[in-house]
């Protein structure tokens, strides 16, 4: 744009570009919203009289072996479809809790939405619902089925269960396997090594680190990391030292060795949680 041309012509040492939003919140799309929400973040605002109709965050790509690989498929890509080998029913897939994207299929085409983000606040959840309404309207597709993550506490899963359509739950790490298969145009069974974090398992425990054998329609869990208590649940994921302490507790019990890296953490309440198995899901 002309604005980019002016900025680059200044020959500044560094230019940092970022979206107009706080972390985990949708980007602002009008002047009043930006001035209200970002007044403590930015010193100056360059405003425009052309309103933005629909949020679409930056796409993120990586160059690998002289090929551009999308890491986050959003502005400039969405809602261009990806193509399936076989035609199927119209399906709405509502994604997971983090880095959410929704998809709507018709025939051999799957229309992916722009990046929505983490569904951890009201603004993001409202954007999630608005995006679903938008893609259904512009493509004039009425889904016959909703596909959701198995995790019962994900907001996307709860939204799906509130609708009056048939549901199909997909295990989180199987979804990763199927996604990689689709990206590489594969049909035959594959070995999937999924080193992902939280994935609600078919056995009701939290999976993480899976060796799966299967295809897009099903899988067998051949090997995995041993389930470990996560003291504090989601808090353990955000504070990995809790997971380290959980491993130490499984080995040493109450006779924990002195670990310099844990000296600045209050470990006793966490040990008590592990002992009593309080708020420490597997």
Where do the model's predicted regions map?
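Acidic, glycine-enriched active-site microenvironments
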Residues: 1-282
């Amino acid at each position: 744009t002309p604005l980019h041309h002016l900025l680059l012509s200044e020959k500044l040492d560094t230019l940092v570009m970022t979206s107009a939003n706080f972390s985990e919140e949708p980007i602002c799309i009008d002047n009043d919203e930006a001035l209200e929400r970002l007044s403590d973040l930015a010193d100056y605002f360059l405003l425009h009289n052309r309103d933005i109709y629909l949020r679409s965050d930056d796409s993120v790509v990586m160059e690998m072996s002289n090929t551009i690989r999308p890491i986050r498929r959003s502005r400039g890509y969405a809602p261009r479809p990806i193509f399936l080998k076989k035609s199927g029913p119209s399906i709405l897939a509502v994604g997971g809790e983090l880095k959410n994207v929704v998809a709507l299929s018709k025939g051999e085409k799957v229309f992916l939405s722009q990046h929505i983000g983490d569904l951890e606040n009201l603004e993001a959840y409202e954007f999630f619902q608005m995006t679903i309404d938008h893609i259904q309207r512009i493509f004039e597709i009425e889904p016959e089925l909703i596909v959701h993550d198995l995790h019962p506490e994900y907001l996307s899963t709860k939204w799906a269960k509130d609708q009056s359509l048939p549901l199909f739950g997909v295990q989180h790490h199987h979804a990763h396997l199927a996604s990689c298969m689709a990206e590489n145009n594969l049909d035959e069974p594959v070995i999937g090594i999924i080193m992902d974090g939280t994935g609600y398992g078919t056995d009701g425990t939290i999976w993480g680190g899976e060796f799966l054998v299967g295809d897009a329609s099903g899988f067998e869990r051949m090997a995995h990391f041993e389930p470990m208590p996560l003291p504090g649940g989601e808090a353990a994921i955000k504070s990995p030292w809790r997971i380290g302490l959980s491993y130490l507790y499984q080995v040493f019990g109450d006779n924990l060795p002195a670990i310099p890296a844990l000296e600045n953490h209050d470990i006793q309440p966490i040990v008590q949680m592990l002992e009593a198995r309080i708020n420490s899901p597997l």
